[in-house]
A protein has these predicted regions:
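Short catalytic helix/loop segments, enriched in acidic residues and glycine
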Residues: 19-44
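N-terminal glycine-rich phosphate/adenylate-binding segment common to multiple enzyme folds
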Residues: 78-122
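Extreme N-terminal starter segment of soluble prokaryotic enzymes
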Residues: 1-4
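Glycine-rich nucleotide/cofactor/substrate-binding loop typically near the N-terminus or early
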Residues: 16, 39-94
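Active-site glycine-rich loop that binds ribose-phosphate moieties when present
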Residues: 83-84, 121-146, 152-155
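Short acidic, Gly/Ser-rich segments with clustered Asp/Glu that frequently serve as metal-coordination loops
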Residues: 10-14
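Short, basic, glycine/proline-bearing loop/turn elements
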Residues: 25-29, 70-75, 121-128
Length: 159
């Protein structure tokens, strides 16, 4: 059985400024390593349940996670493919039984995280059914559309 794990960075433990989430900035390597540690922990937990894990590196350049730091039951999808799935690129109903998320953050209108946004900082807000939608909400609906249940979420407290 397989878990599809979408990993972002703005909800990673301790992160609180944009330069910490931006490749090439001074503190970015520390938080990319923290993102990797959180992803690895989720993969180890999934492994204890007998699950193989495909991790979608879903932040910025999509090359933030160190694949060598992940357990044997995990593989990483790096880079972007141009499709509607975006942060869920690679997900399909025939390959995965479960979906999980690490490092996710609250929506653009939330004050729960200094890095709150939805998809891009250029959008003031994204609304779904009359309510502000976070990337987690949008991506969880995408999994639901495929009939794949969400079993795990880690990120900021405002989610």
């Amino acid at each position: 059985m397989k878990l599809f794990l979408s990993a972002d960075i703005e909800g990673t433990a301790g992160i609180d400024t944009w330069d910490e989430a931006t490749p090439g900035e001074r503190m970015y390597p520390y938080f990319a390593a923290q993102m990797t540690r959180e992803v690895a922990a989720a993969c180890r937990a999934a492994g204890k349940l007998g699950l193989d894990v495909t991790v979608k590196d879903a932040h910025d350049i999509a090359r933030n996670i160190d694949p060598s730091a992940l357990p044997e039951n995990a593989s990483v999808l790096r880079g972007w493919i141009r499709d509607l799935y975006c942060m869920m690129g690679g997900l399909d109903r025939d390959s995965y039984e479960y979906v999980g998320f690490t490092g996710y953050h609250s929506d653009a209108v939330s004050d729960g995280n200094p890095l709150s946004h939805t998809m891009t900082t250029g959008l003031q807000r994204v609304m779904l059914n009359g309510k502000p939608a976070s990337e987690f909400v949008l991506n969880a609906y995408m999994a639901g559309m495929l009939g794949i249940p969400v079993i795990f979420l880690s990120g900021d407290a405002a989610l």
